[in-house]
Amino acid sequence: MIPYKGKYHFTSESVTEGHPDKVADQISDAVLDVLLEQDPDSRVACETMVTTGMAIIAGEITTRGYADLPQVVRDTIKEIGYNNSSMGFDWQTCAVLSSIDKQSPDIAQGVDRQDPENQGAGDQGMMFGFACDETPTLMPAPIFWAHQLSQKLTAVRKDGTVDFLRPDGKTQVSFEYVDGRPVRINNVVVSTQHAEQASQTDIIDAIRTHVIRPVLEPSGFFNEKDCEIFINTTGRFVIGGPMGDCGLTGRKIIQDTYGGMGSHGGGAFSGKDPSKVDRSGAYMGRYIAKNVVAAGLAPKCEVQIAYCIGVADPVSVLCTSLGSSDISDEVLTQAVRDVFDLRPYHISKRLDLRRPIYKKSACYGHFGREIPEFSWERTDAVDDLRAAARR
């Protein structure tokens, strides 16, 4: 458990959409979206691997829809920005291999029900949600600001502000905390792929000027004179993306969530339809935790939900303030049980999860971005939670 007394540092990282693991995540979720758009009841478990000049898709899919998998892959890669074979990965020329089977009937019989309200969980496991009052979107400060840097790094590449940047990149932010509260940014790390001709001096100047300062100066935590800044510290990052590292779906689960703050059940999200509680349960956990904090019941909240395959009701539910509230965890947990139906069908219905919304979630965090598609970021249950906690 993270200490809440004294001074300490906490660090989180983010990657851009051109990072090979994120390329894989986006392809998996692009396939999911194409199928959900045609058939909202699609069962999808789509895994992707990308490497030099090649993308491989495998998994289990049962659907009434159709996906032109090579075209989905190429469109996604093109949108990310791998548009030249010199990068080792080019949307026009990369090979696309696929191996797709139907969902196992053994799993399907545990999930499908004549009464859809009693739909069983698609797997066993535990999922976590987290929220805290460190940022306006109730996310931990380190991951929030790391994602802001990654998004800006991509933006200045795509709009041509810094024309020598390439798609792959990573950011990292370390915060100093005092008695559990973030007080300043202690150090920042940015690594970005770049064109062959770009000099280290030009890269450092561009990242400081166009990425770090515009993003972090408004935060209130950043003093450049009192912050270590590390930019492309190997001195060269020309070979990147799937040419530099093999990318796989589901290998960035910490930055997909809370940057290491709070717990993680281990399940990845991308490529999975809402019947997979790895995804829908974690989204519901975030929704609950965010509403608990927004309701003023606790400045920090962690929710755990656990399921058994084929069983609709969770086998356990916990809502804890991690010692940050005068309201007991027992009261918080009972309030959550009173307000929210945590059966998979009702999670999907409440959050309207059977929509083609997932490709947007596949990079820069599934949580903490308050866009219309992300229903789990709403705070529309605060009144119900306050009333339940008073009972």
From Swiss-Prot:
Disulfide bonds: none
Pathway(s) it belongs to: Amino-acid biosynthesis; S-adenosyl-L-methionine biosynthesis; S-adenosyl-L-methionine from L-methionine: step 1/1
Gene Ontology CC terms, in alphabetical order: cytoplasm
SUPFAM superfamilies, per the entry: S-adenosylmethionine synthetase (SSF55973)
Binding-site positions, Mg(2+): 21
Binding-site list for L-methionine: 60, 103, 245, 276
Region feature Flexible loop, mapped onto this chain: 103-113
Cofactor(s) essential for the protein: Mg(2+); K(+)
InterPro entries, alphabetized: ADOMET_SYNTHASE_CS, S-AdoMet_synt_C, S-AdoMet_synt_central, S-AdoMet_synt_N, S-AdoMet_synthetase, S-AdoMet_synthetase_sfam
Cofactor: binding comment: Binds 2 divalent ions per subunit. Binds 1 potassium ion per subunit.
Listed EC numbers: 2.5.1.6
Keyword annotations: ATP-binding, Cytoplasm, Magnesium, Metal-binding, Nucleotide-binding, One-carbon metabolism, Potassium, Transferase
UniProt cross-references to Pfam families, sorted A to Z: S-AdoMet_synt_C, S-AdoMet_synt_M, S-AdoMet_synt_N
Reactions mediated catalytically: L-methionine + ATP + H2O = S-adenosyl-L-methionine + phosphate + diphosphate
Major subcellular site: cytoplasm
Residues reported to bind K(+): 47
Domain of life, per lineage: Bacteria
GO BP, sorted A to Z: one-carbon metabolic process; S-adenosylmethionine biosynthetic process
TM region(s), chain numbering: none
Binding, ATP: 19, 168-170, 236-237, 245, 251-252, 268, 272
Location in or out of the cell: Cytoplasm
Assembly notes: Homotetramer; dimer of dimers.
Family: Belongs to the AdoMet synthase family.
Role, per record: Catalyzes the formation of S-adenosylmethionine (AdoMet) from methionine and ATP. The overall synthetic reaction is composed of two sequential steps, AdoMet formation and the subsequent tripolyphosphate hydrolysis which occurs prior to release of AdoMet from the enzyme.
Record-given protein name: S-adenosylmethionine synthase
